[in-house]
Structure formats: C-alpha cells, structure tokens
Amino acid sequence: KPNSAISDTLYYIQEDCRFEGEICFLIKDKKIEGIGFGLDLTKAGIQNKMKKKGLPWERAKGFDKSAVFSEFVKFDGNIKTLEMKLFINDILTQHATHDLMIYKPAKILSEISSFMSFEDGDIIMSGTPKGVATYKKKDIFMGEIYIDGKLIISKSFEVK
C-alpha cells in the first residue's frame, strides 16, 4: 500500500468496504524486526470489477486511509505460537494461528525480495483469515496478537 493509505484513524469509507485483520511485520535491515496488528480495507465493488477485467486491484486496495496499524513490538521470528484475534463490538470475528498462514513470513520476505527492495519501516501485511466482512460507523475493532498464548499487542479502533 502507498504511504497515503496509512491512517491513525479507522474511517467508514462506503457500504461495500470490507475489513481484513492481519498479522503485520515491520522491516529493518531487510529483515523482519517487529510484529503488529493491521486492518486492511478493500472496496469490494471496485475489486470485483477489476477481477472481472483481469486488472490489478490497486484502486480497491491502495486508496487513502485504507490501512490502520497497532504499534509494532520486537519479534524474534518464531511463528510456531503466533496467533491473531479480531473482535468487533466484543464479538470474535477473525481468529488465526500460524498453521493457517498459507505463506509463512520467511517465504513472504523471500518472494517479495525477489522483485523489489525493502526499506526500513516497510510493513508486510501477511494475509487474511476467514471472517472478512463489511463494517459501519461507530463499530469498535479490537485487534490482538499473541505469542506463546501471551497477549503482546492489543489495539482498539473506533470507526469514525
């Protein structure tokens, strides 16, 4: 996503805008340095039109204010006990462990490195578990990241 996509506030965009909770990785010195929680927003109607035409999805994914993130904490790379939860209005909406990751962080890093360079501060959004849906104003999102069953990140976003 472009830098203009990153926001401190989660905004209601339009009716067919969907959220995706994701485990995110912060890059430093071309390696994964930190881990955080992110919400990736998608304009579903535009995405579907682009898919049908065989076109890239940038218009649906890279629009202004289409991503919000928690803080990032140091990450040692051990994904075996990694877990993500997303609650909306106190209801568990998405839940994923490392077992559900189609591509593990090392593979994602390797693949991306094969065609582009990383700079310090780049963020990799690792993909989305089931539970993608639309949202509305005043919804309260709570993203959580766990390692070894211990809560290491908890970030709340209220939709404006």
Protein language model regions, located:
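Catalytic-core "active-site belt" of small-molecule-metabolizing enzymes
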Residues: 1-123, 131-160
